[in-house]
Amino acid sequence: MAQEIELKFIVESGSVDALRTHLHQLTGEHHAPVQLQNIYYETQDLWLRRHDRGLRIRGVDGRYEMTMKIGGRVVGGLHQRPEYNIDINQPELELGRFPTEVWPEGTLPDGLAERVKPLFSTDFAREKWLVNEGKSRIEIALDLGEVKAGEFQEPICELELELLEGHAEDVLKLARKLVTQSGLRQGSLSKAARGYHLAQGNEPRLLRPTEIMRVAPKSSVEQGFEASLELALSQWQYHEELWVRGVKGAKAEVLAAMALVRHSLTLFGGIVPRKASAHLRDLLTQVEALMASEVSAETAIYSPQTATAKLTLTEFLVTRGWRTFLDAKAQGKIDDSFKRFADIHLSRHAAELKTIFGHPLGDQYGDQLIRLARNIDSILLLSGAYDGPQARAWLENWQGLLYAIKTRQHIEIEHFRNEAISQEPFWLHSGKR
């Protein structure tokens, strides 16, 4: 088994030549393009997908390799996951050759070998550069081609930085050097993810409202902090993809995701000091200014400013860049229970909302939109330790108020305001529910 660690970028098609020139200037070993054909397999009921596995056969120059990838952690396009590779003599699956730990129950499921069929394919030219960064050996791969499923296809124009040996931090360090020029967009959608989407009919991708952040039982405050930033980054990248594809409303969701990053930093700001995220917040300000200038989606998304901001957030998460700024007292707080933290802050946010909206505001509601949105974001981040339906029902009235204010529906404003301020808490408060 290998532990695959790689960082993915989407390359703007018009920037390929400039990128290739830039890569040739690096000190390293260049490999001319070779053609890679890949067939991905799945069952009719998506057994592999449901068990977070990806199965393919890759062919290059008459040689074949069977690969099983198992879901790991993806943060902003940095993939860290187990990967099993088996050399085979011909392009036919030999599932019995995988080690037993590949399978969820420790053994190849009965009948699975007969049920897996080709689902989609990728065909691309891969050009490589092998470079040293810090104490690490890194492969840079430029992939140009297409992913195809039935009548649907989509271009592949990607750059991957894969750690061959060394440390993930060096991959991020190398990436920082590459994103100084325009044309790169950190992407979390793998070739396989795009292939599955095509195979399922290539339905239009829809806006994805931020949902209540789910956390594991007994999570620490630090785990909650990480989860909040990962959620914000995921929303940012998802809606960037939609924005560049021309989906209406996607730009607003990108800006909302960036605001969620800020709200996360503020929510945990009593523990993680502002100086820990000062550089990140400065970069966010630059990107927000760029997007406010009404540039095109391509200009904004593939800009060095945007790429640097997302990469900095990714690095902040992967390296837990806040830890060096914590004193002993803060370390104790961040190791404490996230649920206890959530109880305290849910009560504070509810009290703030009741203070603001406890009485009619006439024509002054618009002045409170930013505060209302910030409080809703915080409650979305804090509510995951509780019963989902109860938390959603409580939030819906505040979200309804937000929408009514935005759309200036005066009757609806008062309806949702009255409903929202009269709700009972769904969390522990003052020692009771």
Locations of regions flagged by a protein language model:
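Function-determining surface determinants
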Residues: 1-433
